[in-house]
Amino acid sequence: MPTYALLGATGATGSAILRCLLASPPPDLDLNILVRSKQKLLKSFPTLTTTISPRIHIIQGNSTDTIALQQCLEDASVAFMCVADNASNKGVSLTADTVTAIVTTLGMLRKLHGSAYNAPTILQLRSASLNPKLSCQVPRLVYNIVSFCLHYSHLDIVKACEHYEAAAAKGLLSYIYVDPPTIHDAFGPNRTGHKLISCKPDVCDKQETALSYADLGAGFVEIASRKEDFLNQPVGVTATGKAKETWGVLAGFLFDGAKGRARAWWEEERPMSKPQNLFLYCGM
């Protein structure tokens, strides 16, 4: 019987994955869920306490707590890694810190189980902006604006990916990077259809601009069922129907990220005199 682990089930992505698994669970599935607040999870999903299929095991703890992670990852063949920080500020490291703790925990489990250890496949939410074969489909101005505003969040994810790749080389895990476009309609339950995009070809299939969280969650679940097709690779997810677009929310994230970049610039340049700052900023 398979065991899945879900890290971060109260955010938009984790909630979408959980809704999909509850609606159509794989046969005989055990689902370990790691959350900071069990109360918050049950408020969103009150039926979890009586759900029979899949069998639910809720672990309350921080995503960097190796004891909680060991309970969550024990016997898991697939782990959905949805822990992230929406704030793109200098020094953000939640994703990388969580992955570091995951790798440490898997090392403990391999030492505990020895030759019986089975390396799980970690499905990591990433972004099409970090996938050259998908980002090349985006107008350069849009790509540059997004990359500027989400710079620190992207750095956090890139560092996390470096940890995955080093751990995979040691046989601790396999990974799959899940690369959506802009994601909309957080916590909306309605799916309109999705398709996976293989990034093996030199030229990928077209990725639509907007994808709903509900369809992203379904994409994650499909990738888990087809993990052998995508091991240690990125895979795109695109919409096949019309997603409910919530550009105002995304604009807010970009604006906050731009403020984070400006704040970091100001902190770095503050010791200098104002005239020097102005000259450097203008390229003089």
From Swiss-Prot:
Keywords: Glycoprotein, Oxidoreductase, Signal. GO terms for molecular function: oxidoreductase activity, acting on the CH-NH group of donors, NAD or NADP as acceptor. The keyword Nucleus does not apply. Its EC number is 1.-.-.-. It is an enzyme of class 1 (oxidoreductase). InterPro entries: NAD(P)-bd_dom_sf (IPR036291), Polyketide_Oxido-like (IPR051606). Glycans are attached at residues 62, 86, 190. Gene3D superfamilies: NAD(P)-binding Rossmann-like Domain. Induction: Expression is positively regulated by the dothistromin-specific transcription factor aflR. Dothistromin biosynthetic proteins are co-regulated, showing a high level of expression at ealy exponential phase with a subsequent decline in older cultures. The keyword Cytoplasm does not apply. Pathway: Mycotoxin biosynthesis. Residues 1-23 form the signal peptide. Belongs to the avfA family. Averufin oxidase A; part of the fragmented gene cluster that mediates the biosynthesis of dothistromin (DOTH), a polyketide toxin very similar in structure to the aflatoxin precursor, versicolorin B. The first step of the pathway is the conversion of acetate to norsolorinic acid (NOR) and requires the fatty acid synthase subunits hexA and hexB, as well as the polyketide synthase pksA. PksA combines a hexanoyl starter unit and 7 malonyl-CoA extender units to synthesize the precursor NOR. This is Averufin oxidase A.
